[in-house]
Amino acid sequence: MAQRPSVPIAIIGNYISRRRQVSLEEAEALAQGLKCRFLGEVHAIRDGPYSYADGTLESILNLYRDAFFGDFDSETGEHRKEKEFKGEVLSSGLKDIAKQKRHKLANIFMNPKPPKYRSSTSLGGIATGCSPRSVVGVGGGNRCAHRPVCCTDNKFSECLPL
């Protein structure tokens, strides 16, 4: 069994639609800025050797303190169906894992007009007010101190507590 790392992991990408919100380089820079380990795009977990449907995502979350989910630019957000914002299997499953395993998770969705993120109903209003190109998660490292943060302007030079 793999050892749990001493720093949080940042999993940044688009979980549902396969469209990247940020480039891999930008995501990796964000992870480094937060003193997190960068795993890659979230859809690699869904479609690759790991799957939340068969329990391997839960196994991964058992190994890491924090998981980041960056989600959706405004163009993609406009095409999402309303049912995806309700407590579907994905978000409620993550909520259950967070509750059972005490992982800090932020799985956020964007409301494109006006440009803000909104969270799924099952995870509460963590990300209200973030810009459309920001990434929201539970931070690691000194600046974020394991609190929900909004890293803005695609520069990722600061983490702002919500």
Curated annotation (Swiss-Prot):
State what induces this protein: Expression is light-dependent and positiveley regulated by the GATA transcription factor nsdD2 that binds promoter regulatory sequences containing a GATC motif.
Using the chain's own numbering, where are the disulfide bonds? C36-C150, C151-C159
* Keywords from the named record: Cell wall, Disulfide bond, Secreted, Signal
Asked if Disulfide bond is a keyword of the record, the answer is: yes
Specify where it is mainly localized: secreted
Q: Name one GO cellular component term.
A: fungal-type cell wall
> One Pfam family this chain carries?
Hydrophobin
Q: Where in the cell is it found?
A: Secreted; Secreted, Cell wall
* Superkingdom of the organism of origin: Eukaryota
Single GO MF annotation: structural constituent of cell wall
On assembly, the entry states: Self-assembles to form functional amyloid fibrils called rodlets. Self-assembly into fibrillar rodlets occurs spontaneously at hydrophobic:hydrophilic interfaces and the rodlets further associate laterally to form amphipathic monolayers.
State the protein's purpose. Answer: Aerial growth, conidiation, and dispersal of filamentous fungi in the environment rely upon a capability of their secreting small amphipathic proteins called hydrophobins (HPBs) with low sequence identity. Class I can self-assemble into an outermost layer of rodlet bundles on aerial cell surfaces, conferring cellular hydrophobicity that supports fungal growth, development and dispersal; whereas Class II form highly ordered films at water-air interfaces through intermolecular interactions but contribute nothing to the rodlet structure.
Family of the protein in this entry = Belongs to the fungal hydrophobin family.
Q: What is this protein called?
A: Class I hydrophobin 3
Q: Which organism is it from?
A: Coprinopsis cinerea (strain Okayama-7 / 130 / ATCC MYA-4618 / FGSC 9003) (Inky cap fungus)
The taxonomic lineage of its organism, from the top, reads:
Eukaryota, Fungi, Dikarya, Basidiomycota, Agaricomycotina
* Chain's gene name: hyd3
